[in-house]
Amino acid sequence: MAKYTLVVKIGGGLLREGGLAALRAACDEVAALPGRVVVVPGGGPFADAVRAVDGLPNPVAHRLALAAMDQFGAVLAHVAPELELVGAV
């Protein structure tokens, strides 16, 4: 068992700027890291859609932003099927 856990965020800007190939490359780099690694997905284009809706109350926007992270996590799991998609660690 690893002595530590490394937490890495892969943000949605990577998808916007480099597409799926950039996400795959980032996942490859993360997979090469030593020890236990947890990837936290950003919201990506899904969070952008939440931001585009003007006037949402903060609690609603927050809930939607968390859902956006789940959706982007599903994209990461598609791009790198060797990653295990989990809801909690």
Regions found by a protein language model. Give the residues of each.
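N-terminal glycine-/serine-/threonine-rich phosphate-binding loop
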Residues: M1-V38
